[in-house]
Amino acid sequence: MNESYEMIYILRPSLSEEQVNQEVNKYRDFLNEYNVKDLQVKIWGKRRLAYPIKRFIDGIYVQMNYQGEGNQVAPLERAMRLSEEVIRYMTLKVETAVSETPASVPEVLVPEPVEEPTPVAAEA
């Protein structure tokens, strides 16, 4: 059964555009060897990290969404762990959206606005 996955990884900020494309193509080809479906790659570009990672304060973010059996996750993460260009990665299994409507929608009661009395100016 195919599951949906989302992987975000961060590359070293010192990589050139050509090197970034080589890294992206390397991992894209890696996933294609595992016959994943609906592979989408988005390069977010260089962004500031929330905290320093391996002494880097910036990183090049890349997002990959795909559908696969699940046997590709561990080898892909191992390849990224061994790479010097990848400073952080994370893979998430994305839950599919449920298209069913609820059986009954409870009625929501909205309280009526309460009018507050206007203050009377104090006489001196």
From Swiss-Prot:
The keyword Cell wall biogenesis/degradation does not apply. InterPro entries: Ribosomal_bS6, Ribosomal_bS6_CS, Ribosomal_bS6_sf, Ribosomal_S6_plastid/chlpt, Transl_elong_EF1B/ribsomal_bS6. GO terms for cellular component: cytoplasm; ribonucleoprotein complex; ribosome. Pfam families: Ribosomal_S6. Keywords: Ribonucleoprotein, Ribosomal protein, RNA-binding, rRNA-binding. Signal peptide: none annotated. The keyword Flavoprotein does not apply. One of its GO terms (molecular function) is structural constituent of ribosome. GO terms for biological process: translation. Gene3D superfamilies: 3.30.70.60. HAMAP family: Ribosomal_bS6. Binds together with bS18 to 16S ribosomal RNA. Belongs to the bacterial ribosomal protein bS6 family. This is Small ribosomal subunit protein bS6.
